[in-house]
């Protein structure tokens, strides 16, 4: 069973990226050996270096590590628990749980913890649970953990995949853009250069671009954020800054990097890096599908085989109506136990 009270408690803590310490402090105390009915053999608190920390719970020497992240995107949204008819109810009676992190990724935490308790109760002693900070803004916790040198054969990362194994995930590419115009009275635009118009021209070129596609990953997509141009309405904009974020396919990953960094008049491009598209382990007998989001997986380099799966859907993650069905959490708990047994039974099918 999912620990509904634990779920309520962690959802009630604001762990927006940068504020994870409150949640990690709580979990370190709540999940410590001797506190829960099924003890973990060891709990380590690992500093990330930015004021946050990772938590690593282990039973023996882990061959399989369950992993997800403690941070959430803003804004913080307190939890609510509802019956199937939409009425409010106590946590233990809930059909659906709403609030920030309910599926991304605090729902993953409680589902994985439930699986760990089941495995420990069965006497298993070769698994662990890794809770990371900073996933939403750069995988800082994952990068810090990789530096510890820890290694294990299998990693199961919890993300909202509708309890399907992610067969592949798109890559990411991020660029900062600066457009340089020349300020002038807006009544005489022919004597100046509008940075806004330069940006619009660039966006028209991007929208018209024929970006390569591939069968496994589909289309490359992009989004513009951090858009700034502070000119008054009666002055041509002298500058505009923004960031553009691509979700790339294998066919388009190198193409996007080359196209974005071509020299252009009055435009500066600063690459911010990203992750390459990747394929992940799937197992026979388990549902699988590709996903279009990133995760900590590329940065956790000490693991031989990586699986991404978990309860909830990415279609509500990061939204104000983020939610997860309790039945999906229960299903995920059972799924994680089955995956553990399949992996330790050497039933790995392909990567």
What are these regions (language model features)?
Residues 88-95, 115-130, 206-215, 319, ...:
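Phosphate-handling active-site elements
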Residues 95-110, 135-136, 193-196, 323-326, ...:
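Short, conserved micro-motifs enriched in small and acidic residues
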Residues 15, 160, 167, 173-351:
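Metal-dependent amide/peptide-bond hydrolase catalytic core
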Residues 106-174, 214-215:
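Acidic/histidine-rich catalytic neighborhood of metal-dependent amide-processing enzymes
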Residues 1-101, 308:
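Acidic/His- and Gly-rich active-site-bordering loop/insert found
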Residues 2-3, 32-33, 42, 58-64, ...:
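Short glycine/proline-enriched coil/turn segments at helix->beta-strand junctions
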Residues 50-52, 139, 293-294:
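Structural motif corresponding to alpha-helix initiation and N-cap regions
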């Amino acid at each position: 069973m999912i620990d509904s009270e634990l779920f309520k408690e962690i959802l009630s803590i604001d762990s927006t990226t940068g504020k994870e310490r409150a949640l990690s402090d709580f979990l370190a105390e709540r999940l410590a050996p001797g506190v829960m009915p099924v003890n973990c053999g060891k709990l380590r608190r690992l500093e990330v270096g930015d004021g946050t920390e990772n938590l690593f719970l282990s039973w023996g020497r882990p061959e399989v590590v369950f992993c997800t992240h403690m941070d959430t995107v803003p804004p913080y949204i307190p939890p609510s628990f509802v019956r199937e008819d939409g009425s409010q109810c106590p946590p233990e009676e809930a059909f659906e749980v709403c609030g920030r992190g309910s599926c991304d990724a605090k729902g993953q935490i409680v589902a994985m913890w439930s699986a760990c308790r089941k495995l420990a109760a069965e006497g298993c002693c070769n698994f662990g649970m890794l809770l990371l900070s900073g996933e939403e803004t750069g995988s800082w916790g994952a990068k810090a953990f990789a530096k510890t040198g820890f290694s294990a054969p299998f990693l199961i990362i919890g993300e909202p995949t509708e309890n399907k194994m992610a067969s592949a995930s798109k890559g990411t590419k991020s660029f900062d853009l600066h457009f340089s115009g020349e300020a002038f009275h807006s009544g005489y635009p022919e004597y100046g250069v509008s940075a806004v118009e330069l940006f619009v021209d660039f966006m028209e070129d991007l929208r018209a671009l024929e970006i390569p596609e591939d069968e496994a990953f589909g289309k490359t997509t992009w989004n513009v954020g951090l858009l700034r141009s502070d000119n008054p309405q009666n002055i041509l904009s002298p500058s505009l800054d923004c960031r553009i974020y691509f979700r790339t396919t294998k066919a388009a990953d190198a193409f996007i990097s080359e196209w974005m960094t071509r020299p252009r008049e009055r435009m500066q491009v600063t690459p911010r890096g990203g992750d390459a598209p990747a394929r992940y382990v799937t197992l026979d007998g388990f549902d699988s599908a590709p996903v279009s989001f990133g995760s900590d997986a590329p940065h956790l380099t000490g693991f031989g085989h990586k699986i991404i799966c978990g309860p909830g859907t990415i279609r509500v993650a990061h939204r104000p109506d983020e939610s997860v069905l309790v039945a999906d959490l229960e299903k995920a708990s059972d799924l994680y136990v089955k995956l553990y047994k399949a992996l330790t039974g050497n039933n790995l099918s392909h990567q």
